[in-house]
Amino acid sequence: MAELEIRNLHVTAEDKLILNGVSLDVEMGAIHALMGPNGSGKSTLANAIMGHPGLEITEGTITFKGENITEAAPDERSRMGLFMAFQYPVAIPGVTVAKYLRMAVNAHREAKDEEPVKLKDFRKQTEEAMALTNIPKEFSSRYVNDGFSGGEKKRMEILQLAMLRPELAVLDETDSGLDIDALRVVAEGVNSFAGPEMGVLIITHYQRILH
């Protein structure tokens, strides 16, 4: 059984049909790529997987780890192990990267009935993740995506991926707008995280990240 199964998915947004009968399997421990031109519904599919409230699934099912999540709330899907790196990450002025990451990590730990992460352990985990994604330590004291360049925003998404270690990561146009160096960091990060315990779905209209 695939980790994520999508069957005959029909999705509308503002009464307009965007996805018409999409079926897809995403296996655990594999990197999958979904390619297509702009406007073909790739981001709509990603948002439907995560339960975006602005979309309506009129037909079909989404199953994750054997459980039907078609009507599950976004936070419930996240707690189950789904993660999405957004094409256009939003800024959160006043909230530092460190605080944001610790809140996210503790939310996931709470969902597993685990104790909050100790500050010492969190700092060590953050430093290791930043080193892996080639992000300077000073980054943790900045406000989330506030004044970030395009490349920094994408690095922030990969940093979250490194900290949360989800079971399935959906990367929506993560390579969009990146220079060669930033693209390499993203690609290396994805390759290092994908493994037997995590599947990856890359949504893109470029072939370059696949090389």
Model-derived features: where do they sit?
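Conserved structural motif at the start of ABC-family nucleotide-binding domains
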Residues: 4-6, 19
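Short coil-to-beta microelement around the adenine-binding A-loop and adjacent beta1/P-loop entry
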Residues: 16-17, 76, 184
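The feature captures the beta-strand-to-loop junction immediately N-terminal to the Walker
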Residues: 35-37
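ABC ATPase NBD Q-loop/coupling interface
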Residues: 61-77, 145
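Q-loop/switch helix immediately C-terminal to the Walker
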Residues: 88, 94-110
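ABC ATPase C-loop
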Residues: 161-162
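Walker B catalytic motif
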Residues: 173-174
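Helical segment within the ABC ATPase nucleotide-binding domain
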Residues: 183-196
